Amino acid sequence: MIQLGLVKAKDGAYWLDNPQATRYFWAPNGYNLKSGEGYFQNVWVLFNQAVYGFTDHFSGGVGVMPLFLFGGTATPAWLMAKFSVPVVENKFNLGAGALMGTVIGEDNTGFGILYGISTFGSKDKNLNIGLGWGFAGGEMARNPTVNISGMIRTGAKGYFITENYFIGTSDIFVVITMLGGRSIIRRVGLDYGVVLPFSSDMDGFVAAPWLGLTIPFGEKIN
C-alpha cells in the first residue's frame, strides 16, 4: 500500500522521497538521517564508512581505508558526528559536526575537521554552504575551507550532484570540483562523476573518475 506521507506527486506520477538526501558525494548537508536509519558507503573499494541516525537530529559514524589489505602498512581511520536542525521545514536547515581520525600504524598522525553548514531548499533541490577548519598534527588551519554543494532531482530515481571545495593558504589556492550524478536502484545509491582539481600553481589539466555505492540499512519505507 502506498503511504502518501512518504511519497510526493510530480507531473501526475508518484516519486518516493529522496532516500539519500543527507549528503552529496561525500560532504554532509543540513538534513539528517531519521532515527534508526543508516547507510554504508564505499568508494573505489578503498574508502569505507558507515553512518547511523541516533536521533532525528544527531548522526554518527566510523570510516576506514583498509590499505593493509593491499600491502600497505598505514591505515587511516576516523569517527564523525553531525547535529542538524530544520529552521524552516523542508526549506532551510543548519548543522554542525566534526570528523576526527588517525593513521593506524603511524605516530602523531591525528587529523580532522570541524564544520558548520547551511542548506537552502528541499531534499530534492538544494544548495549547501559550509565552512570547515581542518587540523592535523596538533595544528589548526589558519583559513577555513569553503564548501559549496548542490543537488537537483532529475527524475524518479536520478539526481545531479555537484560538490566543490575552496582551500586557501598563504602559499597556494586550491579548488576541487566534483560533478556527476546519483541513480537510485532499489534504494541503493550509485554515485558517479568526475573530480577536477585546480590550483594556482598547476600547469596541466587533471581529471579523476568517482564511483561509489551507498547501501541503506535500518528503517525502511513500506
Language-model segments: which ranges?
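A short macromolecule-binding patch
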Residues: 1-3
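Transmembrane beta-barrel domains of Gram-negative outer membranes and organellar outer membranes
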Residues: 6-114, 119-123, 134-136, 154-222
